[in-house]
Amino acid sequence: MKLVVLGATGGTGRLVVEQALAAGHTVTALVRSPEKLTLRNPNLHVIAGQATDPSAVSHALDGADALISTLGGTGSVISDATQAIVDAAPRAGVSRVVVLSSFLVERDRFDPVTRLLTGLAMRSMIKDKSAGEKALRQSDLDWTIVYASGLTDGPTGGPVVVLTEGRRWSLSHRIARADVAAWLVQAATSPQTSRRSISITGGARTKANVKLEAVRK
């Protein structure tokens, strides 16, 4: 497959690029600063541009099969970039979009005190990501949203748990970026995650290559 990656110079985005290439995919990375992506591979194409610019996103999506976004940022970067994806993807003939989000956005999964504290401390980020996800859910795109717990730089291959309905998040939940990256690449190529959200964290119940049919709606 030909995959487009947004956020490829970030900690998780770099791992998405590496794992996608290792799996035999062709990758196009749309980045603001190409010099920050030092990885070299004949199947990696780097394009300079803003993820918030629909024209740049459309250009990157030319001939692509799917898009994976691991974007972070402040202000309205996430919602603006998501709207750019919603606008550009149909014009480019691409419908498959996988977006990495934060467990902090799933506020109803926290206890009331944690919900209040994180809501105050991370209000801007939660508002931005929530707005972007709303635009994605209301679109006709074939989207998947992956909610990941706190990220670590540990090695891949650790256990991963999919939170089922009714399970609560804890601020102590952690997962390796490499395992999140593996999930994102799997999801981009799996019809089982179509128009679904997935909540993942590290744990002892399943292995890192846990089957995608365990996802929740």
Regions flagged by a language model, labelled:
Residues L30-E35, Q50-A51:
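N-terminal Rossmann-fold cofactor-binding loop
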Residues V4, T28, T144:
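Conserved beta-strand positions in the Rossmann-like core of class I SAM-dependent methyltransferases
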Residues K2, L6-T9, L171-K217:
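Mid/C-terminal beta-alpha module of Rossmann-like enzyme folds, strongest
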Residues T12, L67, G132, V146, ...:
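Non-catalytic, hydrophobic alpha-helical segments
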Residues S69-V99, S124-A131:
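NAD(P)-cofactor binding segment of oxidoreductase domains
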Residues P42-A64:
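Conserved Rossmann-fold cofactor-binding substructure of NAD(P)-dependent oxidoreductases
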Residues L3-A23:
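N-terminal Rossmann NAD(P)H-binding glycine-rich loop of SDR-like oxidoreductase domains
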